[in-house]
Amino acid sequence: MFAPIIVKRRSKDEAEKPFWISYADRMTALMVLFLVVMSVALLAVTRTVSQIEQEKAQRQEDIAKLLDEVEQAADRYPGVKVDRDRDIIDFGDKAHFDKGRYSLNPDQDRLLRAFVPEVLAIARNDLGRKWLKQIVVEGFASPEGDYLYNLNLSLERSQRVLCTLFAPPYSDEKSMTPAELEQVRDLFLVGGYSFNATKYDAATRSYDESRRVELRLEFLGIGEARPPAPVLASGNFGKCALRG
């Protein structure tokens, strides 16, 4: 009357097969995930390092081109040289001072007022606007006398350079434009270094070369923002506070 009930028996292999993922399988999956994450992170770091190296190389290349332009300008003025290792414009004996003095002679005045506008033009080009941060007029003194006296004297020598640039030109000179003078005001700084970095001439047994000024070109670093220029009224540069 009743149909027989048939119970199907599972095979031995099927009965022993686990339902949940084993602990070893979980660890394997986590290890694979960890390796994938680490690979992605290492790839990102590698790309970042490579990008930084490319930016450094591009910066060095751009600055080298800028210094090439400054050298070309300096070549038109005998005695003016560019020290590429120190990013320095060296005027040689064209910007030497007498002992204990901070005044320049007329020929030195003319040289500065002729050469500096060429540097300003370079500062206005694409690479100059991109990398040139500021120009520091560095004054130096010979070791005769005490430190503080020479510190003040070296600062007066660097200040004299700016006074010369803002001074009325001689009748045979071309005047710097108001825009150029404003650029000098915004771009140039002065510094005095007393008798640090002295130069001794063994042949003449003198420190004449120590009594000098140099122009140091300072460049922006990678990612460094240019300091905002102060908002100042046009013109009205004032008068030189130095005597003579």
Where do the model's predicted regions map?
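Short terminal targeting/anchoring segments
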Residues: 1-78, 84
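Solvent-exposed, polar/charged alpha-helical surfaces in well-ordered, non-transmembrane soluble domains
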Residues: 68, 110-117, 156-163
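Short beta-strand elements
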Residues: 73-86, 127-134, 184, 189
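Short, solvent-exposed beta-strand/turn patches at coil↔beta or beta↔helix junctions
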Residues: 82-115, 144-148
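Envelope-exposed proteins and targeting segments
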Residues: 85-87, 91-93, 100, 131-133, ...
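Periplasmic peptidoglycan-binding/anchoring modules of Gram-negative envelope and division proteins
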Residues: 97, 101-135, 166, 170-176, ...
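Periplasmic OmpA-like peptidoglycan-binding domain that tethers envelope proteins to the cell wall
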Residues: 136-222
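Short, cationic low-complexity segments
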Residues: 228-244
